[in-house]
C-alpha cells in the first residue's frame, strides 16, 4: 500500500474560513508564501491593481495557523537583491506570530535587476551569521523558532538515498499541468525535453525517471570533493539545468549559499548542545 501525503502552497489571497478548515483537515503540510516585512512583500507580490497584498494575506495566515494547532506548516519567503537584510524579514515573521519560517534566495538570471550575484555573497553570509545570534537569543529568552535552513540532524540524518540524491524530482514527486502533462517538478514545466508523459494519453517516459534517479552527488563532479555533499545531496536539479544546462552540473552560487547555511546550522546546534 502506498501512503500519499499532500502539501499545499498558497499565496493567501483567496483563503476563506471554509478553505482554511479544508486545508487544516486534509493537508499534511501547508506552505504560506510571504516575503517578510510589508514593504518587502508588497514590492514583489502585487495584486492586479498594482497594490500590495501584505495586509490581506497576513491576517489570513494568522487565522490558518491559529486553527491548525500542532500540524505542520511554515511561512516561506524569497529574498532578493532588494532585501539582502533578510534576517529582518525572518524576525518580522517571527514577531508576527509565525514560529516555522523559511526564506530562500531568488534564483534568476543575473541580468534581472533583483537577481542575486556573487557580489552579494558577503552580505548574505553576514545575514546568516546574524540569524544564528538572533535565534539563540529567542531560545535563551524561552521562545521557540524553527528556521527551516538551520534544521540539521547531526546524529543520524537522512537515509543513504536521501544523502546521495536529496532532490526527489522525477522519482519521489512529479508536477502535473492542467493539460495532464507530467514533469519532474514544477520548475521543469515548459521544458519539453523533460516532459515525462501525459495523464490523458496514459504515457510515462521511464528513461527520464531513470536519468533523474542517476543525478546524485557522485554524478556531479563539483559535488564529489565537497564537504557538504551528504547534507546538501546535490542541490536543486532544476537550478542546475536552468543555469548550467545539465542536471549533473551543480550551480555554484547555490552551492556557496548552501555551504554557508550548513555551517550556521551546525553552529546553531552546537550552541544548543552546550547549554
Regions found by a protein language model. Name each.
Residues 39-55, 62, 66-169:
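Radical SAM enzyme [4Fe-4S]-AdoMet core and its adjacent flexible, acidic
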Residues 179, 218-275:
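Radical SAM enzyme core and accessory elements
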Residues 10, 34-36, 77, 105, ...:
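Glycine-rich, histidine-containing beta strand-loop boundary motifs that form or position
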Residues 123-156, 186-233:
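C-terminal accessory region of radical SAM enzymes
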Residues 1-38:
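Conserved SAM/AdoMet-binding glycine-rich loop
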